[in-house]
Structures are given as C-alpha cells and as structure tokens.
Amino acid sequence: RSRADALGLMTAGSAVAAVASTAVAAATVWTAQTSATRLARFAPFGLRTGAASYLLGIAAWDFIYYWNHRLAHESRWLWAVHVVHHSSERYNLSTALRQPVAEGVTMAVPYGLLALLGVPPRYVEDARAINLIYQFWIHTEAVRSIGWLEKILNTPSHHRAHHGSQRQYLDINHGSILIVWDKLFGTFEPEVERVRYGLTRNIDTFNLGTIATHEWRDIAADIATAPTWSDRFGFLLRGPGWAYERRDELAPAALEPVSEPVAG
C-alpha cells in the first residue's frame, strides 16, 4: 500500500476510535452522575453546602481515588484496563490523555460512595473535575520539583516514579492530588534513579486494538494453560507482577519433552 493509503487508514481508525471513546465515556459519565443523584436519596445524612463540605468532597474523592487506583495496579483484571495508560514509553502531557475507555466505568465507585456519604451530587461532580484537571499537569518532565509542597501533594516527580518500569517504582504513588495517602499506607517512593517509562514488558505497537486488549488476551491465554484452578484464579485476580512471574515459572515445564515409557 502507498503511504497515502496507510495514512488514510490511520486517520480513519483514529476517527472511529475517537467517536467510540467519546460515546462510551459520555455514557459512563452520565450513568455515574445519575446513580450519584439517585443514591444520594439513601444517604443517612446530608452534608450542608459550603466551603467545608466542598473541600471535604474533594478530599474524600482523592482518598477513594487512591484505593481505586491502587487496586488497578494490584488486581490483574483491573490492570488489564489501566495498563493502556501506562503503556506509553514517553512521559509528557499527552500521556495524561492516554486513557482506556473502560476505565470510565470505575467512576461509579467514588460517585456512588460520596453520594451515600451525603456529599451533594454537584460537589461530587466538581471534585471529579478538579481531580481530573490536577492529574493532567503532573504528566511532565519539565518540572523537577515544587519545593516543600512535594511532602503533601502528588507532583510531577512523584508521578514520574509511578510511571516507572523499574522494580523500585512498581505499584507506588497512587494518589491523585495528595501524596499523603501513599505515605500513610506504605506505597510512597521518591524519584531517585532516572525513570524508564512504559511496561516491564513493552508491547511495541501503535495498533489501538492491541493496546486496548493485549492484557485481556494474555489473561485468557494464561488461564487456558494454567495447570490448577488456583493458578487460573491467580492469573485473573492477583497482581500482574505475580502473574508474570508465575507464567515464567510454568513456561519451562510446558516446554519440557514428554518422556516416553521404557519398554521392558
């Protein structure tokens, strides 16, 4: 095919992906917002409007986001969604926009929990927007440090470490606005060694379908070849680190020749 044909296919594919992503994202946001409004009716108490409630909503969203994000790294079926964001081997503002379509579904968790806690739905939506906007600017190598605020906030430095593929940078710094959650729950690690971005095993492709589904396909393959039910559940539910190490442990056994019985 000519270069023009290839460019045309890439453009068409990107357009289709953009339209589909927008439609799914809009649907999930609408669902989350609607569920928050309805769940708020069942809250045992309602917070008053005002600055204190507004700030509480932001802090509560950030706290729930921390656990949501942490689980996305520690459970492989959630990692299969989130891995899209981490598959970039570059780190800049565009990386912040590299988001999986299916991750929008997880927004129902903070929306629903905050609504049940009595946070006004409009405050919940504002908390989400502030959280999302804050995450955008920390995807940069241009800002090395912001001084004493590094102790409190999630910063470009902390988030660069989060995107690292070296062992010391795996499964750390899950906070969005505040880094204090990581310090409280033992998942904080400062940026020391220069970060190598991407996955521990990069996929080396720009194919959108492969980027979005490669981990799901790997999970299916691992489950299909797993020797025990314990391994099958592990490949789906345990962390990706365990899954990759277990796959490597099983690979030599799968390659060993079957011994023939000795005639006698």
Describe the residue ranges of each PLM region.
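Hydrophobic alpha-helical topogenic segments used for membrane insertion/localization
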Residues: 7-36, 50-63, 109, 113, ...
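A broad "ordered helical/assembly scaffold" signature
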Residues: 23-26, 34, 47, 51, ...
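Membrane-interface helix termini and inter-helical loops of multi-pass transporters
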Residues: 33-45
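Membrane-embedded catalytic scaffold of the fatty acid hydroxylase/desaturase
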Residues: 47-201
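Cytosolic-facing loops and C-terminal tails of multi-pass membrane proteins
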Residues: 194-264
